[in-house]
Amino acid sequence: MIVAVGHDLIEIERIRRMLLREGPRAQKLFAPCELEYAARLSDPTPSLAARFAAKEAFQKVWPRPHGWRDVWVERERTPDGPFPFTPPVLGFTETIAEEMRERGWVAHLTLTHTKEHASAVVVLEER
């Protein structure tokens, strides 16, 4: 059963300006795995914008506030598959992960971006 759906749409240039303005402080919004993934790309900003949108989308379905680095987007490498990475999934701190397990919830994530916008949808499902 679907518990909640959260969506966020963000302008990539807004994230680019924030990263330039805040410098290293802006990196505190992202988990190390998110920064490592984005650093491999010729332009990391669209990827980081999509991850920012994922955090916002999750906040819209979660019953209380959480920190920026309490939720992150993970993508595992798949060197033998047709694509270099698996589909994105949400990762959580142990506190959030434990509450998800207790409630029987699973989070589904989809990300996309164009030249101008990044978007994320999070669906919480009760199993």
UniProtKB/Swiss-Prot annotation:
The keyword Cell membrane does not apply. Mg(2+) binds at D8, E56. Its main location: cytoplasm. Keywords: Cytoplasm, Fatty acid biosynthesis, Fatty acid metabolism, Lipid biosynthesis, Lipid metabolism, Magnesium, Metal-binding, Transferase. It catalyses: apo-[ACP] + CoA = holo-[ACP] + adenosine 3',5'-bisphosphate + H(+). SUPFAM superfamilies: 4'-phosphopantetheinyl transferase (SSF56214). The keyword Transferase applies. Disulfide bonds: none annotated. Its EC number is 2.7.8.7. GO terms for biological process: fatty acid biosynthetic process. GO terms for cellular component: cytoplasm. Belongs to the P-Pant transferase superfamily. AcpS family. This is Holo-[acyl-carrier-protein] synthase. It comes from Deinococcus deserti (strain DSM 17065 / CIP 109153 / LMG 22923 / VCD115).
